[in-house]
Amino acid sequence: MQCFSFIKTMMILFNLLIFLCGAALLAVGIWVSIDGASFLKIFGPLSSSAMQFVNVGYFLIAAGVVVFALGFLGCYGAKTESKCALVTFFFILLLIFIAEVAAAVVALVYTTMAEHFLTLLVVPAIKKDYGSQEDFTQVWNTTMKGLKCCGFTNYTDFEDSPYFKENSAFPPFCCNDNVTNTANETCTKQKAHDQKVEGCFNQLLYDIRTNAVTVGGVAAGIGGLELAAMIVSMYLYCNLQ
């Protein structure tokens, strides 16, 4: 009986934390959707660039609703000893776990296909908007500076772009000695070709593989928590009168 009470208490506390996290995500999502201007003032140009591609507000609202509902079900089910709430909590968490595993398998098996698909989408966008659309250009500059990469595939992605047409040169990130913006020479086609700076997609894959232990540890930790929560919910379900 003491073991049951202890596990029940831990289940309530754990899901209360999840519930509060969901409420926070939901609140931020509503804030961004209703008053995006003040959000941009606080978080600066990078948030504006991100919102160019993904509606952050709606994404946070959706994520917040799921996490909020999950935390509520787990907390309510454990507190009131409701079998219906506990089994619903279990199946929602199971679906999330299966989706995560499926996404990981797809990412591992279809990396080449994903690269080809993204190339068809991203490269034309670079050629069309880099150098003319401020937010789009800022996103790529931030990405290339952070990952120390050039374009999606390589420097050729910027050929015929507004930036190239205006400057007759490639972004400084495409030449190694220009990454810190300290070099006086422009990044010409010959120089970019000689430097062979890696494309951002391959660089991202390289960084993930280099930090595979950390990435795997985080993924395993999240998966472990989800499995533990499912086991505990089933334990409570089976031991309720």
UniProtKB/Swiss-Prot annotation:
Extracellular topological domain residue ranges: 33-52, 110-211
Gene name in the database record: TSPAN1
Entry annotated with the keyword Cell membrane: yes
Subunit description: Interacts with SLC19A2. Interacts with NTRK1/TRKA.
SUPFAM superfamilies: Tetraspanin
Biological process terms in GO annotation: protein stabilization
InterPro entries found in the cross-reference section: Tetraspanin/Peripherin, Tetraspanin_animals, Tetraspanin_CS, Tetraspanin_EC2_sf
Cytoplasmic side: 1-11, 74-88, 233-241
Family from the record: Belongs to the tetraspanin (TM4SF) family.
Subcellular localization: Cell membrane; Lysosome membrane
Glycosylation sites: 141, 154, 178, 184
Main location class: membrane
Protein name, entry field: Tetraspanin-1
UniProt source species: Homo sapiens
Function: Structural component of specialized membrane microdomains known as tetraspanin-enriched microdomains (TERMs), which act as platforms for receptor clustering and signaling. Participates thereby in diverse biological functions such as cell signal transduction, adhesion, migration and protein trafficking. Regulates neuronal differentiation in response to NGF by facilitating NGF-mediated activation of NTRK1/TRKA receptor tyrosine kinase and subsequent downstream signaling pathways. Plays a role in the inhibition of TNFalpha-induced apoptosis.
Gene Ontology annotations for the cellular component aspect, listed alphabetically: cell junction; cytoplasm; extracellular exosome; intracellular membrane-bounded organelle; lysosomal membrane; membrane; nucleoplasm; perinuclear region of cytoplasm
TM ranges: 12-32, 53-73, 89-109, 212-232
Cross-referenced Pfam families: Tetraspanin
Keyword list, A-Z: Cell membrane, Glycoprotein, Lysosome, Membrane, Transmembrane, Transmembrane helix
Topology class, membrane: Multi-pass membrane protein
Organism superkingdom: Eukaryota
